[in-house]
């Protein structure tokens, strides 16, 4: 059975979706079969970070309804080990049938080694939907005080839900800004109260790749792309140092 990983954030604007896309493509490049699901109902944008823009047409709701099976999910044209389901645009997270969603995920676990759920920011129904079924949770935060405080609150909520494997990714790390603020990644980790999975540097290539409709890991090999590869290796259980660049 495959492993289900929820990619979460307490605060919007942390770059969670770009991190999710980077991890998914890195896992696929490493040879793992991956299904990436955009769970931000009504506000989907994971397709952009994957370099698919609006070409991704199959939503997870169609699989939940039985219109398609998991073996019919389209593969990424550049990453044959990566499949993608977009979010439906004309419903609310509260409208998702939990039993149908659970059945879809069970089927997905049988087809893929990793299932990544890109959850909406915050602690509402979409967050609970993704976290409830996750084997592991990856919490993405920035370094600004509001983001770190929200990450700590989100971690507490996950603990209350019985989620014990929760790890932190600090995104958009700028060493000059850290120096000016007189903080370190260790400070962010301590304030969030979570173990560290990885650090992703501030990188203009993330925005440029999306603008040119390119997957980040195809657009560049450095910066944020390299950081996502290191995170993927750690998720695979491989020894990989955490670097701050």
Tell me the role of every PLM-derived stretch.
Residues 36-110, 210-217:
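P-loop/Walker-type NTP enzyme "switch/lid" segment
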Residues 4, 84, 196-199:
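Conserved beta-strand scaffold positions in the cores of enzyme catalytic domains, especially
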Residues 99-103, 107-202, 208:
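Conserved catalytic-core segment of NTP-binding enzymes
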Residues 12, 46, 63, 118, ...:
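Residue-level signature of catalytic and energy-coupling elements of molecular machines
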Residues 21, 25-29, 132, 153-156, ...:
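Short, well-ordered alpha-helices that flank and scaffold nucleotide-derived cofactor binding pockets
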Residues 211-245:
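NTP-binding/hydrolysis catalytic cores, primarily Walker-type P-loop NTPases
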Residues 9, 38, 86-89, 119, ...:
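Flexible glycine-/small-residue-rich
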Residues 2-39, 108:
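Walker A/P-loop phosphate-binding motif and the immediately C-terminal alpha-helix
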């Amino acid at each position: 059975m495959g492993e289900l990983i929820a990619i979460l954030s307490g605060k919007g604007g942390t770059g969670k979706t770009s991190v999710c896309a980077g991890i998914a493509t890195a896992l696929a490049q490493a040879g793992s079969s991956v299904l990436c699901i955009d769970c931000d109902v009504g506000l989907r944008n994971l397709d952009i970070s994957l370099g698919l823009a609006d070409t991704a047409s199959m939503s997870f709701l169609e699989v939940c309804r039985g219109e398609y099976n998991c073996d019919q999910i389209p593969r990424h044209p550049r990453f044959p080990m990566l499949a993608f389901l977009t979010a439906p645009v004309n419903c609310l997270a509260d409208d998702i049938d939990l039993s149908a969603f659970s059945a879809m995920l069970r089927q997905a676990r049988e087809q893929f080694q990793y299932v990544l759920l890109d959850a909406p920011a915050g602690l509402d129904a979409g967050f609970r939907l993704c976290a409830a079924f996750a084997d592991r949770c990856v919490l993405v935060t920035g370094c600004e005080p509001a983001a770190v405080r929200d990450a700590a609150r989100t971690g507490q909520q996950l603990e209350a839900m019985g989620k014990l494997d929760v790890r932190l990714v600090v995104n958009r790390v700028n060493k000059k800004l850290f120096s000016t603020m007189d903080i370190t990644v260790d400070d962010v980790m301590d304030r969030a109260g979570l173990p560290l999975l990885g650090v992703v540097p501030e990188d203009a290539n993330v925005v440029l790749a999306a603008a040119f409709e390119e997957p980040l890991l195809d657009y560049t090999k450095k910066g944020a792309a390299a950081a996502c590869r290191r995170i993927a290796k750690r998720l695979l259980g491989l020894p990989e140092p955490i670097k701050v660049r």
